[in-house]
């Protein structure tokens, strides 16, 4: 029975890639800088001491990081008994965004340039805004700028509730984000507005990767909170991914947990499981691992590393989340049977010690575990698509155009 479990620790980079300078990210290192802060005692809020990741260390995380950047992460166990294969991978795609990273993991790098809204203020074309107001029958709009999602809620959330005007904002990523209150504006209405925005952006040739619904609750600045009802409307990958090939060629199953289905625009997904928060995502993953039959991929995105800690530049929070994931990892490892393979990886970096609030261009870890996987280094992988090619070979699918199998 062949089953693959792919876990994306969203934003968990392990050192700047060779081309990081082009992105202003030379010297970034998500894991390395978190580990250094913990070792210095600068991350003792809600946790304490050096970063403690014994289970990820046994899978080769520390060694992969050392190969990536030349420095072993502070506090991690250098003498851990390695039980998995490990590597670090560079991104071939032109961007450092979520769809690019995930599509490349699934064998389809993004070699074109996304469109971006580069102006910090008045970010969106007036013609686009006018169409959204007209088609969605809006009283107007707020924002129209670059912003962190939590900052803009404190700034404009109360006005949004009073006026019914949605909050439009963007970032350095190829995104059009819409924040609306779940109760005063309505969740279904927000989703409808996002569908309209997706249509207008596509028909208008803007080439924007994602429209993101950002629902929130609360009654005043300071207590607004984004909910788990986020929804991403992505464009479809430009070529068949390993997910689509498994379904088409083997009549296989692909179980999306978290935001995976959104990222691939539902293409190649046979089942969707929603969960919010690391524990809930982990619980859902364990359930689906138990249920998985032959020719199945269970694919989970642990978004909180990125959304709650990376973008918010919260070092103690990121460290505590990693330690939580590591504590629970044995539950996952014991569900890996016989011919199964488990792959732990990331889609980009988001160094919480870095300036700004955006992603960082970094190598990602590739940690592979299974009873038949030979432990040891798999070296430097020139593209995330090596993961996709490895999975394609494992399931005996037609080869992907990009990537080399690691097993």
From Swiss-Prot:
Q: What class of enzyme is it?
A: isomerase
Query: Which GO molecular function terms does the record list?
Result: magnesium ion binding; manganese ion binding; phosphopentomutase activity
InterPro entries per the record? Answer: Alkaline_phosphatase_core_sf (IPR017850), DeoB (IPR010045), Metalloenzyme (IPR006124), Phosphopentomutase_DeoB_cap_sf (IPR024052)
Top-rank taxon, per record? Bacteria
Compartment list: Cytoplasm
Say if the entry is tagged with keyword Repeat: no
Query: Chief subcellular site?
Result: cytoplasm
Named in its record, the pathway it takes part in is: Carbohydrate degradation; 2-deoxy-D-ribose 1-phosphate degradation; D-glyceraldehyde 3-phosphate and acetaldehyde from 2-deoxy-alpha-D-ribose 1-phosphate: step 1/2
Q: How is the cofactor bound?
A: Binds 2 manganese ions.
Q: Where does Mn(2+) 2 bind?
A: 306, 311, 359
From the UniProt record, list the reaction(s) this protein catalyses: 2-deoxy-alpha-D-ribose 1-phosphate = 2-deoxy-D-ribose 5-phosphate; alpha-D-ribose 1-phosphate = D-ribose 5-phosphate
Q: Name one GO biological process term.
A: 5-phosphoribose 1-diphosphate biosynthetic process
Assigned EC number: 5.4.2.7
Q: Name one Pfam family in it.
A: Metalloenzyme
- Gene Ontology cellular component annotations, sorted alphabetically: cytosol
Homology family: Belongs to the phosphopentomutase family.
- What is this protein's name? Phosphopentomutase
Q: What would be the name of the gene that encodes this protein?
A: deoB
